[in-house]
Amino acid sequence: MCLYPKLILNRKYLPNKKNGGIPPKCPDERLRYVTAACGKCYECRKQKARGWLVRMEEELRHNPNAIFITLTLEDKWYKDIEKKYNIKGDNNVATQAMRLWLERVRKITKKSIKHWCITELGGNDTERIHIHGILWGVGLESLIRETWKYGFIFIGQYVTEKTINYITKYMYKKDEKHPTFTGKVLCSAGIGSQYTTRADAKNNKYNGENTKETYRCKNGAKINLPIYYRNKIYTEYSLNNVPLKP
């Protein structure tokens, strides 16, 4: 549960594309504001990490061809990107480097690589920004070595649930040396979307007060259904009538 929840205007009663810019009248002023998670505290980041863990495990279930990577940025390239694109900040530079790399990949393959990556600051003397990630696809190693020109490349040939658990922990890792730094997720859209077509997802079908908003893990444990799946499975009516559990 969020450590620092905040009040925001209820989007249901704000102008948007769905209501054609004419929102419905708010029947009760107490509904004008709703409580929302801050999205930045330790608990929020941990909850997001759990959601990503589930989604990547689902992706791996349907697409087991995946590799683990670590990519670094040498100082020369870091400064070059910083100056050329007039950007500041480790995460911004890493994001731009990733964008440029994927553009080179698309130029060669005519398509992008499905990926989930996160930034981290090094713990050694250089404290250099680097990127950990999981890529889905076949025969990627030579392509990566050909196109990533910014620094060191490490490639792990196997990805398991342990790998996913390891990499998602960077989302809420406590870094005493860099207490204000938060790793930035850089990823493809639709990771793990296959779950919504599985038989298990039918158990989440809206059923009033009896709606089951849980996801069953491989070990049998049940956790709250990740927000991504909740938004995919339920209609707007269902979302408004099924309370979001902490």
Over which residues does each language-model region extend?
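Right-hand nucleic-acid polymerase module
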Residues: 1-127, 137-246
